[in-house]
């Protein structure tokens, strides 16, 4: 949409699109003429507590997408639950001294409570231990059996003589036969991701007792995946050929790799008691294996709430779009295994249309581990008293869509305090408080001008992007788009200065009323965009606006709050996170509490000497007594020494932790003070401007100092000018003589040859177009706008690190004064700046409102970029040695942050302490 004022006014004054209705799940059925969206989140094992990685990987991502679908008015049914059958449950029940049913009841309630606290809004959250599960699972199997897609054969299995049972694959560990990973499970290797048979493991061990199992034979049923490969391939090819398919890139890659290797018959039964019984003679003591049984849980859980109407969702492929949300380790089961079962049953099942898989979310620089005390689990997140919506926001901001990411407390604080508190929360409170304080809480009359049309048009463009991102399941990008909208709102208010206009004549006050009315409506529109991400905050904003109903999404920020509308009571949406409290959380969840492992062991008592026969030699008795006493004292001294050493170690650990926490607290307070000072400066300028005090810009001295003119303080001083002598000084006859001439014969300014970051020409750029290099599989060729008359061609080796779709229309930082170089026949005229480790490369990020061509500077080093860096002088190589990502994620050179323009910083998404190059 352009900035035509008449069109903008028409759109702004359009009628409301309707409201989102809260429906009884029993009434949610597919409807003709509507998009009917069926959403599933991978069913978690019921024997554990979900951590943040589990939550973002499936249930939260699916919840956000379901909420978006409801905002768009689609018929949406969202299914979730707990996977309760299998060896994992049996084993956990043994460990906890209860029955499998009791264990399932306990953990189902735990999962349900955690998801409710996180605001996960399932249409129904069920479980797999139901009669409906048995009925549908057995029915699908019997149809597969009848259609000739099953077989039986004796197989080698691992049997633990010590536990007296066949071992399920997940309860055998050993060395992977394919990649030699030494902690592979018996069903799948976490090292290479390939499925394996437990009997093929090297150095296999029973997970329960650590004994070495032996191989025994048992007769099992196999699903003939080889016979079903053609059907499944045809279905997958049709889905992936659709231009609007929403398969994540990792799901596509994993699926294609599986199909390319070819499918083999796979065992679907196990020697267990806790599971869905096999309805065939001779197999009464066996149950279905979890990979066959668990996905059927989606169907049975749907039947638990809809009854016989479950088939309207699950046997209706012509009218239903199925979206599966899974972690990358679940792709094969949802893309290959389960579709094979459905297609082989030949019962018109709704088969996967869109598979949305995430990579892994790690914790800081390690993995989530309940046993090691590392990472945040769902129940612990509640205990922090940080609201659930804050967790939702950060998890979605860091959603691992194309590569593994990591939860970082430092980044968590940064994003919450900067993006939520200072950006989004500041704008909402600012706009609504102005209505409350200057207009008595009543929305003023609005008469739009071209300035208003411009911001509304920009927000309309962002909202179109938001809709496209959500529809394509690019949830992380959608979060950043919302922040862009609130940033535009802040910039609009700042540029229009309604607080100044309020002090002018009647026309000025009317103009201020228009600005504040538009800002208040933008704030309400932000609440709609925010609903899928932060539903509670969205509701709070709508209540403060005095219009709590949730409208359907419209891409244009229409006038929800008409002139004369009475708003509610504005109040701050977010509280600043306290660095001291965060330091406590870092210690608590960092696995530093090793009290059990460091506790002193109980000292063994010295063995008593056997009583000697009585003797008359009293001297001998005394000698023996003194010897025994010496032994006891010596052993006691050793125990005391051990206790002292252990306590000293614990003291040193506590001291180090205390010191680290104090430093982090002081660092956090210092950063917050810097933000507070800037905020107060900004408020002072506003007040002085409102009072009519003229603002005089701070003078800037442009000079190029010599190395000696920059003192240690970093403040650049200009040396007093001297008249040039008529003849060169004796000490430097050549320098004066050889000084280069500028244009017109004038002497050029002295050149500072000091090698530092100021000689780099780094700028913000926007990738206009990116495509694969025609002659190199590992290279991209980008056209990047760096603020010049034409875009630059840049070749980057990012194919293995960043998907092609994420390279389009992306803001980057570009080094522009390297010598152009040909890379496989294409000349590259710049370099995209990335955080780089041996295993991972991330493009450095800049604020979404950054403009192409904006220079990247590093005060106090003078920005004086060479026209082209001389390769012989190794300027780039020298500077690059100290160009790194800080512990907080900022790019810095020798400890000084690199700034976009003069304020914002360039950041790495997850990498810390690595080089930028």
From Swiss-Prot:
Keywords: Aminoacyl-tRNA synthetase, ATP-binding, Cytoplasm, Ligase, Nucleotide-binding, Protein biosynthesis, RNA-binding, tRNA-binding. Its EC number is 6.1.1.10. SUPFAM superfamilies: Anticodon-binding domain of a subclass of class I aminoacyl-tRNA synthetases, Methionyl-tRNA synthetase (MetRS), Zn-domain, Nucleic acid-binding proteins, Nucleotidylyl transferase. ATP binds at residue 370. Residues 702-713 have a biased composition (Low complexity). This is Methionine--tRNA ligase, cytoplasmic. A motif ('HIGH' region) lies at residues 44-54. Residues 756-857 form the tRNA-binding domain. GO terms for molecular function: ATP binding; methionine-tRNA ligase activity; tRNA binding. Residues 591-623, 702-749 are annotated as: Disordered. It comes from Caenorhabditis elegans. Belongs to the class-I aminoacyl-tRNA synthetase family. It comes from the Eukaryota. GO terms for cellular component: aminoacyl-tRNA synthetase multienzyme complex; cytosol. A motif ('KMSKS' region) lies at residues 367-371. Residues 614-623, 732-741 have a biased composition (Basic and acidic residues). It is found in: Cytoplasm. It catalyses: tRNA(Met) + L-methionine + ATP = L-methionyl-tRNA(Met) + AMP + diphosphate.
């Amino acid at each position: 949409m352009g900035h035509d004022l008449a069109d903008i006014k028409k759109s702004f004054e359009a009628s409301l699109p309707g409201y989102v209705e809260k429906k009884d799940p029993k009434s949610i059925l597919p409807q003709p003429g509507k998009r009917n969206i069926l959403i599933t989140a991978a069913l978690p094992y019921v024997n554990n507590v979900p951590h943040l990685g589990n939550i973002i990987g499936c249930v939260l991502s699916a919840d956000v997408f379901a909420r978006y679908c409801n905002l768009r008015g689609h018929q949406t049914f969202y299914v979730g639950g707990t996977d309760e059958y299998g060896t994992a449950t049996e084993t956990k029940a043994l460990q906890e001294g209860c029955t499998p049913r009791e264990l399932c009841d306990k953990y189902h309630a735990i999962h349900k409570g955690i998801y409710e606290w996180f605001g996960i809004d399932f249409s129904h959250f069920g479980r797999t231990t139901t009669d409906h599960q048995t009925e549908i699972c057995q029915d699908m199997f019997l149809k597969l059996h009848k259609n000739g897609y099953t077989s039986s054969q004796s197989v080698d299995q691992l049997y633990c003589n010590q536990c007296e049972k066949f071992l399920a694959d997940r309860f055998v560990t050993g060395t992977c036969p394919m990649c030699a990973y030494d902690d592979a499970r018996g069903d799948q290797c976490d090292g290479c991701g390939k499925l394996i048979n437990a009997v093929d493991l090297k150095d296999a061990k029973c997970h329960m007792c650590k004994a070495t199992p032996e191989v025994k034979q048992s007769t099992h049923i196999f699903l003939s995946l080889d016979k079903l490969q053609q059907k499944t391939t045809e279905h997958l090819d049709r889905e992936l050929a659709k231009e609007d398919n929403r398969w994540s890139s990792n799901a596509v890659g994993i699926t294609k790799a599986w199909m390319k290797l070819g499918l083999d018959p796979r065992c679907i039964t196990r020697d267990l008691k806790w599971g869905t019984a096999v309805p065939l003679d001779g197999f009464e003591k066996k149950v279905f294996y979890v990979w066959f049984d668990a996905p059927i849980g989606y169907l049975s859980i749907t039947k638990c709430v809809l009854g016989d109407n479950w088939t309207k969702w699950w046997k209706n492929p012509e009218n239903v779009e199925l979206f599966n949300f899974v972690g990358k380790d679940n792709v094969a089961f949802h893309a290959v295994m389960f579709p094979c079962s459905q297609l082989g049953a030949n019962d018109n099942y709704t088969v996967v249309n869109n598979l949305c898989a995430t990579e892994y979310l790690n914790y800081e620089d390690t993995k989530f581990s309940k046993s090691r005390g590392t990472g945040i689990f769902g129940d612990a997140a509640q205990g922090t008293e940080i609201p659930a919506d804050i967790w939702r926001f950060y998890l979605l901001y860091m959603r691992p869509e194309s590569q593994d990411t990591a939860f970082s407390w430092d980044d968590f604080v940064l994003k919450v305090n900067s993006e939520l508190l200072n950006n989004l929360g500041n704008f909402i409170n600012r706009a609504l408080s102005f209505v409350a304080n200057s207009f008595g809480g009543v929305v003023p009359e609005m008469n739009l001008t071209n300035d208003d049309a411009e911001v509304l048009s920009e927000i309309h463009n962002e909202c179109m992007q938001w809709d496209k991102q959500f529809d394509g399941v690019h949830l992380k990008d959608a979060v950043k788009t919302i922040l862009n909208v609130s940033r535009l709102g802040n910039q609009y208010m700042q540029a229009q200065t309604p607080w100044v206009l309020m002090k002018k004549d009647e026309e000025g006050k009317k103009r201020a009323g228009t600005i504040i009315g538009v800002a208040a409506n933008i704030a309400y529109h932000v609440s709609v965009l925010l609903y899928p991400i932060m539903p509670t905050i969205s509701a709070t904003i709508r209540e403060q606006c005095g219009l709590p109903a949730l409208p359907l999404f419209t891409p244009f920020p229409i006038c929800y709050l008409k002139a004369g509308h009475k708003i509610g009571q504005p109040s701050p949406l977010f509280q600043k996170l306290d660095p001291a409290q965060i330091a406590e959380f870092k210690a608590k969840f960092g696995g530093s509490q090793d009290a059990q492992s460091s506790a002193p062991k109980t000292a063994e008592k010295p063995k008593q000497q056997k009583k000697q026969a009585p003797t008359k030699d009293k001297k001998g008795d005394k000698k023996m007594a003194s010897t025994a006493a010496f032994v006891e004292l010596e052993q006691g001294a050793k125990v005391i020494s051990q206790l002292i050493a252990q306590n000293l170690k614990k003291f040193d650990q506590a001291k180090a932790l205390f010191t680290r926490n104090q430093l982090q607290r002081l660092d956090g307070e210092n950063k917050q003070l810097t933000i507070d000072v800037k905020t107060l400066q900004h408020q002072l300028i506003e007040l002085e401007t409102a009072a009519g005090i003229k603002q005089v810009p701070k003078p800037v001295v442009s000079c190029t100092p010599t190395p000696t003119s920059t003192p240690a303080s970093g403040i650049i001083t200009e040396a007093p000018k001297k008249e040039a002598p008529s003849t060169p000084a004796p000490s430097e006859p050549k320098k004066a003589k050889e000084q280069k001439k500028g244009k017109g014969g004038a002497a050029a300014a002295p050149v500072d040859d000091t090698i530092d970051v100021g000689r780099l020409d780094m700028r913000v750029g926007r990738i206009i177009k990116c495509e694969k290099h025609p002659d190199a599989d590992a290279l991209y060729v980008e056209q990047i706008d760096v603020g010049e008359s034409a875009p630059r061609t840049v070749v980057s080796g990012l194919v293995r690190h960043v998907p092609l779709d994420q390279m389009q229309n992306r803001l980057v930082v570009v080094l522009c004064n390297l010598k152009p170089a040909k890379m496989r026949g294409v000349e590259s005229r710049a370099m995209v700046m990335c955080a780089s480790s041996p295993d991972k490369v991330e493009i450095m990020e800049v604020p979404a409102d950054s403009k192409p061509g904006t220079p990247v500077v590093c005060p106090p080093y003078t920005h004086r970029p060479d026209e082209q860096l001389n390769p012989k002088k190794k300027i780039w190589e020298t500077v690059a040695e100290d160009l790194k990502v800080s512990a907080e994620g900022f790019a810095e050179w020798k400890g000084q942050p690199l700034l976009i323009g003069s304020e914002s910083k360039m950041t790495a998404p997850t990498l810390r302490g690595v080089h930028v190059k």
